[in-house]
Amino acid sequence: MPSANFRLARRGLLFVISSPSGAGKSTIARRILAEDDEIHLSVSVTTRPKRPGEVDGVDYHFVDVPTFKKMVAENQLLEWAHVFDNRYGTPRAPVEEMLHKGQDVLFDIDWQGAQQLWQQASGDTIRVYILPPSFEELERRLRGRGTDSEEVIQKRMARAASEISHWDGYDYVLINDDMDECVKQVKNILTVERIKRRRQIGLIGFTRKLLAPPED
């Protein structure tokens, strides 16, 4: 009889969290990673300058533009996008390795990256979009970070409406008016998606064994 710790083999999933800047996707992603040891962050490649406190290979893989273009040309990226004068992309090899090992991969990316990822791996990709409760609250959060200039804040606000217009391309859409509640909802989505039948690749073998005639 299976023990309380019995688990079937399953295929990993690609779990995307997107939002306009300031709506909370990065904070939610950090909370999920800290509280769930079965999911791992996809570390993006970027051409943007490293910010204080960021670690190469942990927060991002920081590269120059020629290196990034070479990675695109050689199909080393699952998805990539040009955002605020910088390029961002997802290295293909580590993601595919984790997926085949049954490990989940978390993506903190925008709608362009989510769309490309879906086009390449629709059966493995789950997309969650985080909305702010209002544009006023979105601006308040951006200013509260204290990391962006007035010019950058205005650019982010101007881009927010365009980004939000793509909400209907996602599987789940949440309004982040309470961070703890929003994190709870995201964790619930993750739990449900993990136990869907198509992900339980060990079910066929298990049921065959379960239904096999008992040996004499």
UniProtKB/Swiss-Prot annotation:
Residues 12-191 form the Guanylate kinase-like domain. Its EC number is 2.7.4.8. The keyword Lyase does not apply. It is found in: Cytoplasm. InterPro entries: GK/Ca_channel_bsu, Guanylate_kin-like_dom, Guanylate_kinase, Guanylate_kinase_CS, P-loop_NTPase. Keywords: ATP-binding, Cytoplasm, Kinase, Nucleotide-binding, Transferase. GO terms for cellular component: cytosol. GO terms for molecular function: ATP binding; guanylate kinase activity. It catalyses: GMP + ATP = GDP + ADP. It is an enzyme of class 2 (transferase). ATP binds at residues 19-26. SMART domains: GuKc (SM00072). Belongs to the guanylate kinase family. Essential for recycling GMP and indirectly, cGMP. This is Guanylate kinase. It comes from Zymomonas mobilis subsp. mobilis (strain ATCC 31821 / ZM4 / CP4).
